[in-house]
Amino acid sequence: MKILVTNDDGVHSPGLRLLYQFALSLGDVDVVAPESPKSATGLGITLHKPLRMYEVDLCGFRAIATSGTPSDTVYLATFGLGRKYDIVLSGINLGDNTSLQVILSSGTLGAAFQAALLGIPALAYSAYLENWNELLNNKEAVEIMGAVVSSTASYVLKNGMPQGVDVISVNFPRRLGRGVRAKLVKAAKLRYAQQVVERVDPRGVRYYWLYGRDLAPEPETDVYVVLKEGGIAITPLTLNLNAVDAHREVDMDSLNRMVEYINASL
């Protein structure tokens, strides 16, 4: 099996290294990722300037860094390098990607959506963390995360993406320990109340920061499962944004079997 691993936190992110290590048992792995953090770039691609690719040594394995966005990396790996992939794994993102509000701007999900547009099964992984030390200093948590990545990816490689699903988003809670369970849930609409802060620089020119304040999570959504229940949210997503053709058959049996398969690995 040919696997592409990418992310939006940049080629030097510990999360990318973890995802690469977790994927090694599944097949032949290529790592192609942005040279620097490209968070919140969504499905954006680079059309206004040329793109560069170059090899980097990441403490024992080689990766290809690109000057583009996460979405660009999928294009470059597929068409620039001429590779044919069986699956694309994006992440592991530092910070959760829960709610449609976040999903639609996420570079992690953007890479997965780009893969899906090219007909490649794709999974995106994100963790509700403030820094990587929270995870890397916890061997049990790393093992659980590895089991989830391995089980989700191997399920899709063996069975294909469930009918009606284009991308699967996996969000890990802050604390991963024995007893944690995966749960199949929809994405909430909102994660944050959007706000803008206006400030003035030393030259008297105004500038602005965009940020968000946490909203109360809606029950039975990805936000609620990760933030309130401390579970692993498994959220199936579709590329179909057509309101006229919104109805789409989804193979819930396959999705439920996937979650059972994940939980059996924990």
From Swiss-Prot:
One of its GO terms (cellular component) is cytoplasm. It comes from the Archaea. Nucleotidase that shows the greatest phosphatase activity on purine (deoxy)nucleoside 5'-monophosphates, particularly the substrates 5'-GMP, 5'-AMP and 2'-deoxy-5'-AMP. It is an enzyme of class 3 (hydrolase). Belongs to the SurE nucleotidase family. The keyword Cytoplasm applies. Keywords: Cobalt, Cytoplasm, Hydrolase, Magnesium, Manganese, Metal-binding, Nucleotide-binding. It catalyses: a ribonucleoside 5'-phosphate + H2O = a ribonucleoside + phosphate; a 2'-deoxyribonucleoside 5'-phosphate + H2O = a 2'-deoxyribonucleoside + phosphate; GMP + H2O = guanosine + phosphate; AMP + H2O = adenosine + phosphate. It is found in: Cytoplasm. A divalent metal cation binds at D8, D9, S39, N93. It comes from Pyrobaculum aerophilum (strain ATCC 51768 / DSM 7523 / JCM 9630 / CIP 104966 / NBRC 100827 / IM2). GO terms for molecular function: 5'-deoxynucleotidase activity; GMP 5'-nucleotidase activity; metal ion binding; nucleotide binding. InterPro entries: SurE, SurE-like_Pase/nucleotidase, SurE-like_sf. The keyword Hydrolase applies. Its EC number is 3.1.3.5. HAMAP family: SurE. Transmembrane segments: none annotated. This is 5'-nucleotidase SurE 1. Homodimer. Its cofactor is Co(2+); Mg(2+); Mn(2+). Optimum temperature is above 90 degrees Celsius. Binds 1 divalent metal cation per subunit. Most active with Co(2+), and may utilize Mg(2+) or Mn(2+), though with less activity.
